Amino acid sequence: MPSLLLSLLLLQVPIICAWLLVRFIIDLTGKNGTIPTIRRWPALFPEFLDRLSYNDNAAQLVEEGYRKYKDRPFRLLKMDMDLVVIPLKYATELRAITSDKLDPLTASFDDNAGELTGILLGSELHSDAIHRRLTPGLRIPSTKYCRILTVCAFPERVGYLTDVIGNWTPVIPYELVLRLSTRAAARVFVGETICRDEVFLETCSSFSRNTFDTIATFRNLGKTIGFMLGILTPSVRKAREQGAYVQKLLGSEVERRRACPDEKHDDFLQWCIDLARTEQEAKPEALATRTIGILSMAVVHTTAMATTHMLFDLLADSKLRETLKKEQEDVLPSGWDGIDQNSMLKMRLLDSLMRESQRINPVGEFTFRRVVRKPITLSDGYQLRRGQQIAISARRINMDGATLEDAQTFCPSRWAQETQGASFSHSSSSNLHFGLGRYACPGRFFASYMIKAITSRILLEYDFKLESGREGYRPPNSIQGDKILPNRDAVVLFRRREVSI
């Protein structure tokens, strides 16, 4: 097997060298004179060197571009594409442009290493299912989803936390929350039977990790090289094996449900079955792939990152931790037996912390990723050309003192006294990380419920502290190109308290 892999690698070398030469020539002959380019290397060097070094310097390049060209577009040279960063002043008119002109699906496909992962391509079926079935259900005054999120996430007690009151257990928070998120979301996405399948649950958690590692590799290598060498990468091979397992499992479930039309199911998989409009969308394997892709990456992975960031924020501030615990006790005086939608809405300080934590620690530098499908002339005459990839530098905008007072300061209660429009899940030009317009993240309301459910229950039932015992210390983030991750190595000690649930 190793010799076969080596042979395949050697066969790829001439192709890669030829591609690098072509890319070098394109850089020399295809200069874009209308958009300033932010470079790490001096102008006399080829742009290809900037592409190679982008991931090591992304944060500094974005900061420099925003500082110099805050009110005009600038260009970044990524390994797999040119990215045109659009200023905030265009946000209002861009959000109204339809997907036939500004394509969010292809941009998401490219950003998620679609050639290697095979997720999120082809249609907006998943968005339709969330908009038309999931989100309306969250708005109904009911305990249904609140109970699902907490009971399924914490089955009888969390097996990877000690069940013995008073004992400290070492835990890696990201892994803990990844498992909790998977359990909570699986019930809503695949139904009651499959959500209890431990192999499926572990596969979903592992698929999230492997897919993210695949995406990181893809961004380092670029689209062409990544596609050619991807099959040699362990995370790619493992993710594909897991994808095949899920295709078989969920594909069989789709066929079984179609054979038993009298059965009633209320989950994401069934919503996609019901709402599929084309033959391709309705294929069992396509439904399975879409379900695992959305569940693992759009729901579980992003929820796990946001919740882990918040836990680290709480670790660094014992006063905040106690204040939030008091809020949960006031909102839920009888414990989780009394949870409902109204209780979730009363968690104003927790919601404020969620938004502020995401402002400081978003998933990445950019939002509103789009591919320009048709030429667009904006109100001031600026033209977007067909084929360009564009994005808005959400992180820099939200950290700009001209946009937000005292923007460099982390203030957990910043949004607690504001109106509902300032909530974590509200999408606007002042809360950009969920995107803008009709294509803003459709699952942000469900994500808000998940994060609140998991964090609130941890606050009510557990004490936690850093294994190192360092007070006031927050484990540093991990930066991968223009993506921002919580520390996935920090060890935290958890101890269950005596509570009445």
Swiss-Prot record:
Location(s) in or outside the cell: Membrane
Any Pfam family hit: p450
Main subcellular location of this protein, as a coarse class: membrane
Recorded family membership: Belongs to the cytochrome P450 family.
Phenotype of null mutants: Leads to the accumulation of terpendole E.
Positions of transmembrane segments: 2-22
UniProt pathway: Secondary metabolite biosynthesis
Organism: Tolypocladium album (Soil fungus)
One GO MF term: iron ion binding
Its job: Cytochrome P450 monooxygeanse; part of the gene cluster that mediates the biosynthesis of terpendoles, indole-diterpene (IDT) mycotoxins including terpendole I, terpendole K, terpendole C, as well as the kinesin Eg5 inhibitor terpendole E. TerP has dual activity and is able to convert terpendole E to 13-desoxyterpendole I and paspaline to 13-desoxypaxilline. Terpendoles biosynthesis begins with the synthesis of geranylgeranyl diphosphate (GGPP) by a yet unidentified GGPP synthase.
One GO term of the biological process aspect: secondary metabolic process
Protein name: Cytochrome P450 monooxygeanse terP
Record EC number: 1.-.-.-
Record has Kinase as a keyword: no
Cofactor dependence: heme
Membrane-related topology note: Single-pass membrane protein
Keyword entries, A-Z: Heme, Iron, Membrane, Metal-binding, Monooxygenase, Oxidoreductase, Transmembrane, Transmembrane helix
